[in-house]
């Protein structure tokens, strides 16, 4: 069976929207769940020289689209933390997600983290907020705090990000079905069909 991977970063509201529904879409299709793989989108942008939509003058169009999708799906009003997307960008939540993955809790941690950011408007550069998300999925805060500082966790995040770059990933969220990339929350259904072999 073709491997499917979901690449994301907690700075992305479109990743939040995708994270809230990707598991359900794959389950409904009877397809094996994708591997959740957090990456450093900041490093992707720096390496590729791409400019994110959140820096553009017409970004209000995206804000409206994000809220429209959230409303359609019964999600809370989308809130952006003060300083988003640059001033409060941090690798702490992504490193914590890598740590959670080792405990089999990457999905529950990631959802808790996304909800902290875009439903609660909380700044994830504040490690206390990362630890609240960790506690919500029964990860011990002290263990997470130690884990995100270890070289092995940092190396795994770096390796995941390099893997995404090697595949040709340009934006997030991206769902990779084998070598085929589906960029965006609005292309999840296509990714599911590809994973289903349809």
Where are these regions (language model features)?
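C-terminal cap of thioredoxin/glutaredoxin-like
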Residues: 4-5, 10-32, 112-198
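Structural alpha/beta surface segment adjacent to cysteine/selenocysteine redox centers
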Residues: 14-117
């Amino acid at each position: 069976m073709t491997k499917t991977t979901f690449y994301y970063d907690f700075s992305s509201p479109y990743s939040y929207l995708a994270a809230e529904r990707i598991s359900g879409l794959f389950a409904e299709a009877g397809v094996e769940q994708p591997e959740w793989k957090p990456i450093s989108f900041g490093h992707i942008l720096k390496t590729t020289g791409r400019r994110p939509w959140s820096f553009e003058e017409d970004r209000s169009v995206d804000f409206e689209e994000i809220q429209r999708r959230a409303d359609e799906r019964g999600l809370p009003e989308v809130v952006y933390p003060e300083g988003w997307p640059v001033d409060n960008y941090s690798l702490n939540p992504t490193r914590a997600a890598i740590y959670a993955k080792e405990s089999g809790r990457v999905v529950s941690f990631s959802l808790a983290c996304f909800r902290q950011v875009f439903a609660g408007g909380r700044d994830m550069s504040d490690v206390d907020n990362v630890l609240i998300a960790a506690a919500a999925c029964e990860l011990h805060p002290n263990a997470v705090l130690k884990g995100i500082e270890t070289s092995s966790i940092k190396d795994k995040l770096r390796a995941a990000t390099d893997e995404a770059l090697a595949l040709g990933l340009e934006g997030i969220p991206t769902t990779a079905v084998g070598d085929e990339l589906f960029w965006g929350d609005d292309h999840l259904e296509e990714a599911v069909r590809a994973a289903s072999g349809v």
